[in-house]
Each structure stands twice: as C-alpha cells, then as structure tokens.
Amino acid sequence: MKQYSKTISTSFDFLDNFRLAKTDDERYNLLLEEIDDTDVDDYHGNIEQLLFNYDYGHGTIQNVEITDGEVSKDGKGVLNVEFEVYYYFGCDDYNRTDEDNMQIGVSINFKNGEITITGVEEQERLPDEY
C-alpha cells in the first residue's frame, strides 16, 4: 500500500487565530484560507499537488474543489475533495472526463507550525506481465 502526504508551512497568525476560534466551522474556514493562501507555485495549489501523486491511468486532474470537511480544536480533520480526471486519446481524436473524489486527512502540528494533508492509501501497481 502507498499513501501520499504533503506538508505546508503555516503563519503564526493562522495558528493564533485557529487556537482562538470558538467553533469547528470557524476553524474549518481558517484552514481553507490557509491552504489556499500557501500555493507552492503559480499553477497548482497544495491539494492539486497532493492529487498529482496518484495514478489516474494517463488522465490528468482538473477542476479541484473542496466540497466540505471538518477540523477539530486539536487540529485533526478531513477534507472532501471532488475533481475531474481528463483523458485525451490522440490517436482516436477523442477525449473523456470522469468525476472522482477523495477524502484527505488533515493534521496541524502547532509546535512546528505545519499542516500535513494526507491522501488515501492505494494499492501499488504491480509490474506488467510479459
């Protein structure tokens, strides 16, 4: 089994505001803002970069959206993510888009100021038979 994760450095403001939040909804909204504000490059956000690690059978992911989730005061939670997998078959001049989703685990390390997002476990691909 293989599982991918990504660690995101956070700001001290985020950690302070998270600790002061009174409800799980407030904490959830703060988490979403922090993940969106810490894009690693100009093209792909943190969730997308985590999803790129998984095998979609020659498909590429697009239109990633966090649909809901929850996070508790201790910094543990989940995010439900929906996305599309786009396939282009050049030889047939044909394309297809499938909808998919993944539940992503969230863990905030208050001491180190980091958020770790973790995808689902998947079977490792077996070698092709000859």
Question: Residue ranges of each PLM-predicted region?
Answer:
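Beta-strand-rich solenoidal segments
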Residues: 102-104
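A short, amphipathic edge element
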Residues: 55-68
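Residue-level signal for secondary-structure boundary sites
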Residues: 87-89, 112-114, 125
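Short beta-strand micro-motifs enriched in acidic
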Residues: 107-111
